[in-house]
């Protein structure tokens, strides 16, 4: 083929390589991206991590631009049409050495997760090397990725003129087709090539509680996002084993009906918890505290937006993960990778995870780290599962859903599960900076309630509602200096004084209990993303916890009915309030919707509201 003149993009999806050519433009906001009006018209948007600034979220501003390739021509080519050559990186090393990275991991475990700032966080480091001819090197690496990497979502090379990106991303961030929005949370890592792993090793990986909970946490986080995108929330499908050349992951698909514009969806879903953490907006703050530089496009998205033959908007937007960034100006090659840190993470285990994640890209540049696996298609694209079709592996995957909430396995329209005592009753949800409240809103609407959801700092009055939900959120509930905790205590005080029917969840529960005079403490081990069986008011329930702090059970019950989790409160009931330390809306709470229904009926019946 003729020598390509940038800008252009080569994208391999579905065993075909698409060559897109056009012009590149730079934009300030996602809403500034041009609308694709005609069937067959397309644009390829490159959304940097710093785009968070347009939503007011925390990040290092490194100036990486929001760009779009306005597609003017498209053709399909084969691997044989690509230039041949050798990809080689020289003087390559991670910018943060292994020991330093392990110390950074420990700092996040001790300073953030243990202090209630979140359940999981992704800490990045970057492999940096140099090459002589960036364009030739990029093409050689692209060709190698097509042959070597298996089961990638996109394998691509994008040349904007002053920057080159080549990678094999495993993960769809979000897609849109016929009004259905799909996300694809991937987490949990088998840190070796599937082709060299034994069945016992794969089954041990699938039964590892750390790996299992890691995936459940990102499923919860993406369910939050899709509850913002569609009123009926998301529906989960999976889990599946996703096998790459040098490692394997577990994954779900989550789908939601939506009427949102593609650009609005991109804005609402910045960015995937698999590249950031949870709760998402506090994860951005934690990343800014612990990473010393901007992320460029790492953790951002590439979004191919167009229209189908019926005029419906379409979008295919993978995460920018497992990508090498080549700078023609200085010959540098950068491969950023991150590990997901959760309670129980081993710092050096997370070091090994970053090596495994970088390996798939680095092998394409001649940095040999281990064998590949899989057969190849007619295009030379590696494919074919090694373990995904094994009966024991499939059974192990299916068994994971036995512990999860069936609520999120099907759509529930507003009022579909209506309870007479709840129909038409009004509820205010106070959002304490955790979008679990968006999942709560979906559940409450399905029960027939009329829902208003507000950030804590936008609530002017709690009057005029039949019920108030004091929601979850990150942070130390004992902090007298934190404005959010001050506001949350004030809400709890007013709700108790007015005898307003109240459901308080996690942080809201802790703040309400503090106003009731109960003692809070920091747990010796965080319960972030843990499922625990607890006796709850006469029933044994599997409950999903995301807490680093808890309320100690009082010696005397007083006016309360208590549910204990050892020395701590799992829940308490008062005459006009219920406090729940766990998350009934979480996929980890097996019968969360039934628990919500019982408590809401009790509250609204007892008070005559």
Outline where the language-model segments fall.
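An anion-binding catalytic pocket shared by soluble metabolic enzymes
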Residues: 4-15, 122-213, 305-335
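Non-catalytic accessory segments adjacent to catalytic cores
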Residues: 12-137, 211-213, 231, 237-242, ...
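Contiguous alpha-helical scaffold segments within structured protein domains
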Residues: 73-92, 130, 190, 197-288, ...
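Conserved hydrophobic core element of enzyme catalytic domains
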Residues: 255-388
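Acyltransferase
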Residues: 384-419, 586-609
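A short, charged/proline- and glycine-enriched loop
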Residues: 419-427
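Pocket-forming structural segment of enzyme catalytic cores
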Residues: 489-495, 501-505, 509-598
